[in-house]
Amino acid sequence: MSGELEAKSRGDTQSHEQKLCYRWTISNFSFFVEETEEYITSLVFSLEDNDKMTWCLRVYPTGVDEKNKDYVSLYLILLSCEKGSVWAKFEVCILNAKGEKCNTERIPSFSRIQPHQPFGFEKFITRDSFLSPAQVLTPDDKFTLLCKVSVLQDSFSISGQNPRPAIKVTRCTLENDVGELWENPLFTDCSLLVAGHEFRAHKAILAARSPVFRAMFEHEMEERLTNCVEIHDLDPQVFKEMMGFIYTGKVPHLHSHSMACDLLAAADRYGLEDLMVMCEDALCRSLSVENAAHTLIVADLHSTEHLKTQALDFIIVYASEVSKTSGWMSMVESHPRLVAEAFHSLASAQRVFWALPFKQLKWSLRPTQL
């Protein structure tokens, strides 16, 4: 008598999926749509826990080739990875002036992507769409894209004799739990005095996060003996934001230019390198005609070379507008060396003008992402 054999053992092959989300804003986009340049490239971005796999977005405002000249083309490009290729899928959409998603395009199934192989849409959106810019651009002529990428990580197999019910692994709450320590004075062992305000904290956390605090509590200093630290020349609200970062790794108010500048100074003072990078990134993104000169001063003061380069590049592009601002006038009086650097950069750019064709010149001067 024949019959089906019963499986006495089993095996499961599983794959882990990692996701990232990247937002890219291009200023003065209608300018690019009207021109016949080749493409604009975003900054490099990566997964939070895998900086060896890097990506960028590339937009062709007048189409990737002649047959697509009536469209804006958009591609995701894998720049580097530890292996020869990755399996990924992605979707991208436009964020309009109201922050609403529109014109969503997606590649729904996982595809093998090779480094530097364009992966995307040759007909992402028609150029005619920009004849009614309110549909796709903000009032200040910014074009914002939101890109979501899913990457299939290595698969692994699990074997077993008898099926067992799956165990649901709960989300790790460490970040929130440590954040609660900052909100709750229970078990604190030191005081931080800032302009008449007292903040309670934990020496172990301060020492683990900041080399400056560690030195205070390690050596025979007054702070170690009294468990009290007096903080001078720091606004209480800025200090509170810095402490929130120390406990949670988050900074919710970096959208404010003044807060980002003050936090950059505090991060430099207390050796918080990750916070410095976050502030530098926020200040790069918020560069404007009004704050460019002040941003250059801040970047120079705290030796943030990337921010300084971005500020100088911005001033070169908008030299006539920036030179009329109160910030520039103030910098002429207080930091003549930086004014000289800006003029030197501008002179170098003008030399490029005579050495390059007009189209190539424009791309060498104008930032692709502000």
UniProtKB/Swiss-Prot annotation:
Which GO BP terms, alphabetically?
Answer: protein catabolic process
- Can you give the residue ranges of the BTB domain? 188-251
Task: Please report the stretch or stretches of sequence annotated as the MATH domain.
Answer: 19-149
In Swiss-Prot or TrEMBL terms, this protein is called TD and POZ domain-containing protein 4
Q: Which CDD domains match?
A: BACK_Tdpoz, BTB_POZ_TDPOZ
- What domain of life? Eukaryota
Fetch the Pfam families from UniProt: BTB, MATH_2
* Family statement drawn from the similarity comment of this UniProt entry: Belongs to the Tdpoz family.
| SMART domains attached to this UniProt entry | BTB
